[in-house]
């Protein structure tokens, strides 16, 4: 029991720290300078109380620490989601040591991204950042609310003096010494009711005081007078909505209603709990029975599933091989078609007589060209021989002239 109380107190302390941390971050305008810049969602009030998503919470924790360190004027590399958590935690502890914050925990405590250690670190950094930013705090101002008399407050504020009549009747049985005190009390009550009588246009009570004093001596007349004015004796108390007495009375009323309704609700909840428990036990027993009956079939299904997977894998392999062979076959067939077209084209060209005629024309042309070339060669040889003969004759003439001067 004591351990449960301690856990509850610790949980309440963490909730308070988380709420206080969020308020400080709002004072530092983290929604504009941090969330909007990195396109992040706003934090809930108890985001760092319990670890629900350690990866995301650790990244958010390191990002807020980095932002607060910037506010404090400390240099720290902005953490990324893929960074080593141990390195980032070590850097945070190093910065805590630089600002003289005692560190009595291991770095791996920060890797969870939530819990009392992370809350303490963020609380210290946010407090220091608020001091550096010189955030001003103002005294809480409670706006004056309009005075009103609600239904509930009217019932409690309007005092109908029925109890006073009973008390006066009981006091009438006492000795005569108490009569003077009762008369004095009655004068005070008449004095309280005096403004209402004046406002209604009744006779002024000051003029009737001697008559009332005379009638006070008679006990019976005193009671008749009391019965006459008793319905008009109402005291209105101005109620304040912030009065702690009103809150206590409301709390007591609510507590009474809760206690009255809790018995019925508790009985119904116990009945539902017993029904749910019985149904769950039936479902569990039925599940066990079905598992025992279906166990051989499940085992057979597993074996057939494995065999089916093997066959499907082999089928996929054969299908891939068939696709490859089909592609190769298509290529061979295309090549065959090309060869066939080329052979048909060549056969058609060979069977046609135009090629033979072209060959004959080419041969005849070659013969003409050969005869022309032979003629040109003969002419060249003749010209060459003639030139040689002319030179020989000129040489002989020159020799003869030299011998016969």
UniProtKB/Swiss-Prot annotation:
Residues in coiled coil: 252-380
User: Looking at the keywords, is Membrane present?
Assistant: no
Query: Pfam families per the record?
Result: IFT57
Keywords assigned by UniProt, alphabetized: Cell projection, Cilium, Coiled coil, Cytoplasm, Cytoskeleton
InterPro entries associated with the record: Intra-flagellar_transport_57
As for subcellular location, the record says: Cytoplasm, Cytoskeleton, Cilium basal body
Keyword Coiled coil present in the record's keywords: the answer is: yes
Q: Which domain of life is it from?
A: Eukaryota
Q: Which residues form the signal peptide?
A: none
Q: List the record's Gene Ontology CC terms alphabetically.
A: ciliary basal body; cilium; Golgi apparatus; intraciliary transport particle B; microtubule organizing center
Q: Name one GO biological process term.
A: cilium assembly
Give the protein family: Belongs to the IFT57 family.
Q: Which PANTHER family does the UniProt entry name for this protein?
A: IFT57/HIPPI, INTRAFLAGELLAR TRANSPORT PROTEIN 57 HOMOLOG
Q: What does this protein do?
A: Required for the formation of cilia.
- Name the UniProt record assigns to this protein: Intraflagellar transport protein 57 homolog
Q: Give the encoding gene's name.
A: IFT57
């Amino acid at each position: 029991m004591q351990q449960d109380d301690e856990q509850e107190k610790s949980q309440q302390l963490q909730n308070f720290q988380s709420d206080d941390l969020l308020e400080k971050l709002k004072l530092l305008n983290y929604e504009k300078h941090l969330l909007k810049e990195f396109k992040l969602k706003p934090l809930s009030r108890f985001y760092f109380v319990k670890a629900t998503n350690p990866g995301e919470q650790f990244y958010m924790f390191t990002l807020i620490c980095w932002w607060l360190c910037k506010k404090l004027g400390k240099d720290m590399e902005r953490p990324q989601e893929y960074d080593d958590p141990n390195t980032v935690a070590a850097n945070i502890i190093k910065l805590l040591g630089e600002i003289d914050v005692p560190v009595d925990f291991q770095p791996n405590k920060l890797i969870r991204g939530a819990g009392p250690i992370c809350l303490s670190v963020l609380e210290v950094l946010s407090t220091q950042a608020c001091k550096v930013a010189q955030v001003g705090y103002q005294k809480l101002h409670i706006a004056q609310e309009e005075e009103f008399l609600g239904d509930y407050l009217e019932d409690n504020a309007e005092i109908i003096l029925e109890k006073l009549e009973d008390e006066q009747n009981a006091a009438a049985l006492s000795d005569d010494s108490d009569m003077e005190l009762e008369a004095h009390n009655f004068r005070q009550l008449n004095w309280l009711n005096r403004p209402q009588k004046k406002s209604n246009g009744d006779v002024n009570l000051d003029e009737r005081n001697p008559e009332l004093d005379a009638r006070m001596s008679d006990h019976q007349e005193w009671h008749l007078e009391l019965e006459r004015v008793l319905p008009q004796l109402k005291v209105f108390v101005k109620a304040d909505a912030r009065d702690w007495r009103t809150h206590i009375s409301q709390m007591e009323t609510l507590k009474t209603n809760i206690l009255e309704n809790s018995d019925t609700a508790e009985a119904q909840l116990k009945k539902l709990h017993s029904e749910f428990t019985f149904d769950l036990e039936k479902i569990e027993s039925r599940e066990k029975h079905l598992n025992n009956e279906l166990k051989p079939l499940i085992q057979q299904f597993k074996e057939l599933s494995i065999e089916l997977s093997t066959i499907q894998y082999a089928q996929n392999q054969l299908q891939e091989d068939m696709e490859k062979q089909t592609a190769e076959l298509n290529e061979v067939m295309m090549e065959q078609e090309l060869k066939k077209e080329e052979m048909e084209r060549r056969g058609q060209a060979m069977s046609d007589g135009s090629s033979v005629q072209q060959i004959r024309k080419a041969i005849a042309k070659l013969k003409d060209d050969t005869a022309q070339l032979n003629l040109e060669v003969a002419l060249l040889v003749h010209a060459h021989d003639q030139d040689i003969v002319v030179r020989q004759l000129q040489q002989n003439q020159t020799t003869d002239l030299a011998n016969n001067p």
